[in-house]
Amino acid sequence: MDGALTISQALHSAIAQGVARLEAQLLLLHVLGRTGQERAWLLAHDDQALAGTEQQRWREALVRRVGGEPLPYITGWAAFYGLDLQVDARVLCPRADTETLVDWALTLLPSMPCVIDLGTGSGAIALALKHQRPDVHMHARDLSADALAMAQANAQRLGLDIAFSQGAWLEGLTETFDAIISNPPYIADADPHLAALTHEPLQALTSGADGMNDLRAIITQAPACLKPGGWLLLEHGYDQAAAVRQLLQVNGFVDVQSRQDLAGIDRCSGGRCAAETDR
């Protein structure tokens, strides 16, 4: 990569090292100080040479991406449900599959609902719901002070009113909610896939020997914090849907069901807190 490196050469170098074309384009746009919406600009200027400082920043960014660091950590931004969220290594990178959880919640919420997002991280779920439904009284909770700081910064920048609190799941809460929503840690402690996730916070990923410790805790605590007829919606692992549905049923939830992610895998499961009309 010595000499005058053109935009075309930079992209081809990244792709040759295993970086997906779209990610290579977004990474280069970041280095050039342009937005992710300017991919067409790259095509129109593919023979333009990078300045010396740009080449150095490109090399550094490419080394990080080839080394497995998630693109949002390098650029500092992640897109989720039409929102641009600030992210770094303090929080899990928002995944497109988690938008399934937001889609589902939006179909269930009554007028002016009270909703809580547990383990909010960057604030992705809470902010998406508040943005789509301004009438929602939105709460967001996380055990990590670092994660809460990032979520609060995102909320302030986006002008979205969220009530934040620090704590472990629903412990100590006295409010009741129309919906409890969470994308908790659900990877088993010894899962071999963790090797590919070393840049992300471990506490946001793993949950005991079977990956279900936090799911069990939330499902057990939720009935006391849900209004009659309120919903608990959870994201979980690709092979955990049946176990989560069983836990929901054992804990008295009705209308227990799952929703599929973008790959057609049962990725979210939930149930409704029984109301008087269900008895």
Question: Where are the language model's segments positioned?
Answer:
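Active-site beta-alpha loop architecture of Rossmann-like, nucleotide-cofactor-dependent enzymes
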Residues: 72, 187, 239
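Conserved SAM/SAH cofactor-binding pocket of Class I
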Residues: 93-194, 217
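Mobile active-site "lid"/loop adjacent to the S-adenosyl-L-methionine
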Residues: 185-214
